């Protein structure tokens, strides 16, 4: 498990949201409280976040962004191509990072072994040391509250930040809304 962060992605009825905390840890020490581990890609039509080694994650972001561009913004194709590249490249197979990527149609977890996983419910995914806390909170809030998508992500990450020592409550979110 990566003791680095918590990233939560939620694909709701009207919006897709990704959120992450701001803590950067090195061993038992907090190095930074306001890091941004999420990004907008493809002119804001795709959202992505990472957990794990920061240097490795930036390499993965760059590679994924190139594949997304070459696939003309097709997230599914880019995710599959990403997995193929990851498995072919010996250097990439040693990277210690995971990513979540989503648009209004899909949400994928890209694992450190090159796997591409779409969550069973197709709506909620989380990674990082606080990922299971955030995922549990998001599932409960999605089922038992009337929170909008962005507030659901924020509240879920808040809960994870209160439980996981590698996650803080300095939360950043990005949103994709349906075209009106």
From Swiss-Prot:
Name assigned to this protein: ATP-dependent protease subunit HslV
Record SUPFAM superfamilies: N-terminal nucleophile aminohydrolases (Ntn hydrolases) (SSF56235)
EC number per UniProt: 3.4.25.2
Subunit (UniProt): A double ring-shaped homohexamer of HslV is capped on each side by a ring-shaped HslU homohexamer. The assembly of the HslU/HslV complex is dependent on binding of ATP.
Family label: Belongs to the peptidase T1B family. HslV subfamily.
Catalysed reaction equations from the record: ATP-dependent cleavage of peptide bonds with broad specificity
Protein role: Protease subunit of a proteasome-like degradation complex believed to be a general protein degrading machinery.
Domain of life per record: Bacteria
Subcellular location: Cytoplasm
Residues given in the record as Na(+) binding sites: 161, 164, 167
Summary of activators and inhibitors of this protein: Allosterically activated by HslU binding.
BP GO annotations: proteolysis involved in protein catabolic process
Family annotation (CDD domains): protease_HslV
InterPro entries (UniProt xref): ATP-dep_Prtase_HsIV_su, Ntn_hydrolases_N, Proteasome_sua/b, Proteasome_suB-type
GO MF annotation list: metal ion binding; threonine-type endopeptidase activity
Principal subcellular localization: cytoplasm
Keyword Hydrolase listed: yes
Organism in which the protein naturally occurs: Campylobacter lari (strain RM2100 / D67 / ATCC BAA-1060)
Active site: 5
Keywords: Allosteric enzyme, Cytoplasm, Hydrolase, Metal-binding, Protease, Sodium, Stress response, Threonine protease
């Amino acid at each position: 498990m990566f003791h680095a962060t918590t990233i939560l992605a939620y694909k709701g009825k009207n919006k897709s949201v990704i959120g992450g905390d701001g803590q950067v840890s090195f061993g038992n020490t907090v190095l930074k409280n306001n890091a941004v581990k999420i990004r907008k890609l493809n002119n804001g039509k795709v959202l992505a976040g990472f957990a794990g080694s920061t240097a490795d994650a930036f390499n993965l972001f760059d590679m994924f962004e190139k594949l997304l561009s070459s696939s003309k913004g097709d997230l599914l194709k880019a995710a599959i191509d990403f997995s193929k590249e990851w498995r072919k490249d010996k250097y990439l197979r040693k990277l210690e990072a995971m990513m979540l990527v989503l648009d209004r149609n899909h949400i994928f977890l890209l694992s450190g072994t090159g796997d591409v996983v779409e969550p069973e419910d197709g709506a909620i995914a989380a990674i990082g040391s606080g990922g299971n806390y955030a995922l549990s909170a998001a599932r409960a809030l999605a089922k038992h509250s009337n929170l909008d998508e962005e507030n659901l992500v924020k509240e879920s990450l808040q809960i994870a930040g209160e439980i996981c020592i590698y996650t803080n409550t300095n939360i950043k979110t990005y949103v994709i809304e349906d075209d009106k």
